[in-house]
Amino acid sequence: MKVRVWRYDVPTDVREEFEREYGPEGSWAKLFAASPGFLGTSLYVDVRSRTSYLTVDRFADDEAWQLFRAEHDTAYQEVGVRLRHLTTAQDDLV
């Protein structure tokens, strides 16, 4: 299994929109679903700060992830640009 983990800092005034867009039914998950190897997305919030989040995106294996990126890179970049106002920092952890 290939797991991608990202950490995000989110301003309080856009938390609801962030949770919609980055959650299991959001824009990223819908885009990833174009891959037959996509297994799901989970969203976690830091209960102490309420402004730090983790996303965990699961693919069948690294090959499925690489194939998705090769076939959907333009859409991937477009979603990133469209949603960048929802975060003040992001780190690709895994």
Listing of model-derived features with the role each one plays in the protein:
Residues 2-9, 40-70:
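Short, well-ordered beta-strand segments in beta-rich or mixed alpha/beta enzyme
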Residues 8-11, 15-16:
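N-terminal presequence-like segments and adjacent domain-start helices
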Residues 15-18, 52:
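Alpha-helix N-cap/helix-start motif
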Residues 17, 23-39, 58-94:
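An amphipathic, aromatic/His-enriched active-site/gating alpha helix that lines ligand/cofactor pockets
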